[in-house]
Amino acid sequence: MSDSAPNPFPVAWSDPRREAAFHDWLRQVAPAHALQPATVRPASADASFRRYLRIDGDAGSYIIMDAPPEREDCAPFVKVAGLMAAAGLNVPRVLAWDQPQGFMLLDDLGSRTMIEVVDAEPTPATQALYLRAVDALIAWQLASRPGVLPPYDEPLLARELALFPDWYLAKHRGLALTPEQRETLDAQFRLIMQRNLASPAVYVHRDFMPRNLMIPRDAAEPRLGVLDFQDAVHGPITYDIACLMRDAFLSWDEEFVLDITVRYWQKATKAGLPVDADFGEFYRGVEWMGLQRHLKVAGIFARLTLRDGKPKYLADAPRFIGYIRATANRYRELAPLARLVDQVEGSDAVTGFAFGRV
């Protein structure tokens, strides 16, 4: 089915008042863009309270964001979209926005995400896609300016790390930490934050992964489309490359992770970005940043299941625990975290790889 073909499944609305408000808004914006209201159908939903609809127009299809204002603030999306467009990234344009009601009309970048087209093995075609992602990331980071986006600071890092004991351990695993275990975890969290906050700061997408990168409809367009950027911050330069290569939904062997990461590092160095001059040190920073993200995401996915009724996300928990365990077992300073995770998960520890235990 093409992107412009009507979907046989109607759009469901749980709130009749919001449904009526949507149709009123759509009638107002339709003439300016030659929209066809009868073609509205679901496009996608994400882990938030936003959802996306697709609608046809005379010039092709468009995307509508449905973001209830009491649940979602669209202002950051609009701001970051402008920053990314100015940096030369391929992002959807905001064509119409009803801020009080949370309806937005956007360009349609396509229906195929990068995660849908990459091969199961790291083929040359897959490598080429990842290098296109690296190019987008470097363009984004080169546009960085302090004071424009919220800082990815210690309070934010601490709130994110707290999701692991609060939601993954306590609510998902049903584990009540002993005072000694809590003290150990807090000390490990302080160490993780200290290491990550030492990294130079740039613009950070925060979910820069194949699920949020789009394959352009136009084969001549070299830039991947970039989505889901509304939570962008100013923080560690190691974050987005860690997110790209230690994906929440896709795992790669260390050889491929190293290959793409070193290519990113080489391009970043040449572009003048503030990466460590030694790749080994830089990669260790990437691993420590990835560890923070995986602890956070394990907690978020538990919360999505237990609080928000979205159980599909927690199915990927073993991937995060594997990431956490691999990094914690590689670094001596993280041995207490490795032991705690092994106690919780009831599995033998893994050994380090690539750089070995350091």
Roles of regions detected by a PLM:
Residues 129, 205, 230-237, 283-291:
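Secondary-structure capping and boundary motifs in well-ordered enzyme cores
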Residues 36-41:
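Conserved N-terminal boundary motif of the eukaryotic protein kinase catalytic domain
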Residues 2-33:
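Juxta-kinase regulatory segment immediately upstream of eukaryotic protein kinase catalytic domains
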Residues 43, 48-157, 162-163, 169-174, ...:
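ATP-binding pocket architecture of kinase catalytic cores
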Residues 165-172, 238-274, 288-308, 320-327:
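Active-site activation/catalytic loop segments of kinase-like enzymes and analogous catalytic loops
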Residues 22, 29-31, 145-150, 156, ...:
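An alpha-helical support segment within catalytic cores of ATP-dependent transferases
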Residues 296-358:
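ATP/Mg2+ or Mg2+-diphosphate-binding catalytic cores
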Residues 49-56, 64, 94, 103-104, ...:
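Active-site acidic catalytic loop and adjacent metal/ATP-binding pocket
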